[in-house]
Amino acid sequence: MENILGLVALACGLIVGLGAIGASIGIALMGGKFLESSARQPELINELQTKMFILAGLIDAAFLIGVAIALLFAFANPFVLA
């Protein structure tokens, strides 16, 4: 029982930690490419900015889904037999 709870706690930490790292790297790369493309073609800044914010929201949504799954495992643990 304690072994399962320890492994679930470790898994929750990995889900949140790796999800945060992945989301931050993705948003950083996307922001860098946005700045590069807006410097190259300044007349497209409005269109690119709209698309960048939509994609940033989708990247954050994927991270928040991972956080929700980690919270499910932490508080309503389906691996522990009742």
UniProtKB/Swiss-Prot annotation:
Residues under site feature: Reversibly protonated during proton transport: 60
Places the protein is found: Cell inner membrane
Example of a GO MF term: lipid binding
S-S bonds: none
GO cellular component: plasma membrane; proton-transporting ATP synthase complex; proton-transporting two-sector ATPase complex, proton-transporting domain
Family statement drawn from the similarity comment of this UniProt entry: Belongs to the ATPase C chain family.
Protein name from the UniProt record: ATP synthase subunit c
Encoding gene per record: atpE
